[in-house]
Amino acid sequence: MLSDHTLRLLERIDKAKKLIDAHRPLSKSILSRLREQMVLEWTYNSNAIEGNTLTINETRLALQDGITVRNKPLKDYLEAINHKNAIEFVEKLSSVHSKISERNIREIHSLVLKEIDSDYAGTYRDINVRIAGSKHVPPDALVVKKKMEAFARKTLNSKEHPVVEAALAHFELVSIHPFVDGNGRTARLLMNLVLIKRGFFPAVILKNDRLKYYDVLEKSHSGKIDDFIFFVGRSLERTINLYFEAIPKIKSTFITLKEASKLSNYTVDYLNVLARRGSIPAFKLKRNWLVSKKAFLKYVQDNQ
């Protein structure tokens, strides 16, 4: 059972997606720029969460120019290149009209660890493991394959809302922890494969949100999955906002709550409450709520 604030977030995401879809096809230059930005941010943040020491600019040099940075481990450079290749594989899988399979997950993992740990790349663990800082104990190595088969069959390709399916896919994969290393990066790639395959955008979990990310994941192990679904949804909403910023026709149809207040008898504080409740069609751009001017004026008229 999802909480009201998660349901409102999902509704907001659906409305935002419909708005972007209504402005398709987007120009090739906008799509190219957005993709380049997403690949960089996704790669940098996902690797940084796992301890990679490359800065975002060093990651950009590695991805775009193949330049290694002095005094940084070769492993960090390989992780950046591997992650970019894994994203390209995920994009390819998302365009194929077949279900996401257990084999696909192993293929993604194989790309993540390529030339870093060839013995375990794409191979399920044959030892028992613990997750650092977590009370959760992953299943015995002997049952990993069976667990993964059941996971692919029951959780992936479900009829849940795409954000819910993506969050559950991520959570269940890290719960099984099927690999010796690379579980987190593989889980985030799988999460976004689910989203992209179902017509959404990748959700980038930021390095700066690492502690919150681990906290909501840990709570999920005790049955409180709603917080993690909300966390994934907010990460996706951040990507949607990047699309809004990049599409002038969309951006020009929205006004700030301060501007909306001048068109009505509502205060900015009250409009902020309405926006958070989902009562008015608003979205958050960075720290500011924006509302559709046309839809807001209709709301005012309907509630006079």
Model features per residue range: what roles?
Residues 1-181, 185-304:
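FIC/Doc superfamily catalytic core
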